[in-house]
Amino acid sequence: LVRDPTGVLYSHRAPCGRWLPGGASSAGAGVLAARFGGRDLDELGARATAFEHTSVLAYPLVSRGERFPFAAPDAEAFMLGESAGDAERFAALLQGVAFVERLCFDYVDLLGLPTNGELTLTGGATRSRSWCQLRADVLSRPVRLVEQAEAAFGMAILAAAGDRDLATVAGEMVRTRAVLEPRPDRGFAERYVRLVGELEARGWLGERLAAHARARS
């Protein structure tokens, strides 16, 4: 039994009777549509690869307030540094989402839950292979991409399982598209630590999690 003193981690009951721990961050891919509505996001994403080493730092909240991996109702999005244009700002947001994802793993690790094992990415964001590679780099671990990554496919697996073992049915239906290995020479750890420091300095991120995130970087 793991207790979360901040109450930001919760569990869903799985159909197989187990519990699935998780959290819902207010930062995510929705910020791209919010900031660049009506734009060709694929085209921006392609141009953003040239700014992998940007010094622009972004905390990509979609709206006011954060709920995971820390609770901060007054938290607001920010972007620090001068950019060369939309493509660099887009790159900073992609990195910011990946940094928040890493902070989520750091918090779960701080609570004492295992975070090792195979990591599979799902959802619409997996259509961008470069962003998936970025996430592998920031997380410093391999990520698996599957052929069908949409939530509707998960519902199809549940329907197909019936009274069979869900894990067995999922293993039969899910097909791996690619496995992306992390590139350790990309230098994201320093920028991640910068973001942790900015969140802590604003009083949103607690000292204990900030120290743990730095120690794991």
Where in this protein do the model-derived segments appear?
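Active-site core segments that coordinate phosphate-bearing ligands/cofactors
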Residues: L1-T120, R127-A151, A156-S217
